[in-house]
């Protein structure tokens, strides 16, 4: 069984937990996810099954959409509600939604982030959270990420008794963006400590949350021998690339890892999906130096 499963990952489990459960349901070890969701975050997690594992990197490179909450008034070690409170202030009055929207909009475009110390990013072969738990200091490398949009989806709420304000947001962002860090940086621009207090992934790899299946739904489909109904075709991961259907003689060349001339296609492509017998077989890319097309990823040679 080959294809892509948009899984609805519930809160309380790691992304690897989800993979392990899917392996049991699909009865195969050839399964992998396309981008970690923290345990306390729910939402769509694309899972690649069988030959679809060969396109997992394309899914990881795609944009993502989240909705969530930012709470102004305190900050934690983990930048979410899982960590210890490290700073706290009581807001005497709320920020206007006009001001909040102005701040959110200032993040649109390419920005520089310093990822949270409690993250799985590796520095010198060691994960950052391992440094944090050991109490060791480490220089966290900056990274450039892209924010497509960042907006409020509901009016903010002010808790006068606690002196805290909650912002309800939606963000479209590129690969590698830490939404926790976005929340903290919003607070910095407003001059107060902040934390990401809730998060749901709405979209990943082109899959909307409404397309996702829960583990209980998968178990039901497995019991009914209908698991294949949960899978999208492998080419869904690269659906934005142009498609070219190979002739038999071309397929024989491609199957053996051969090159294709620039005259093969009517248009100039940087990358192209190659199909044979109505199945995606591989992705070819243009080699400018050699003026030819060559394999970028072989997917299905059967």
From Swiss-Prot:
The active site is at residue 38. GO terms for molecular function: RNA binding; tRNA pseudouridine(55) synthase activity. It comes from the Bacteria. It holds the Pfam family TruB_N. Its EC number is 5.4.99.25. GO terms for biological process: mRNA pseudouridine synthesis; tRNA pseudouridine synthesis. Transmembrane segments: none annotated. NCBIfam families: TruB. PANTHER family: PSEUDOURIDYLATE SYNTHASE TRUB1 (PTHR13767:SF2), TRNA-PSEUDOURIDINE SYNTHASE (PTHR13767). Belongs to the pseudouridine synthase TruB family. Type 1 subfamily. This is tRNA pseudouridine synthase B. It comes from Ligilactobacillus salivarius (strain UCC118) (Lactobacillus salivarius). The gene is truB.
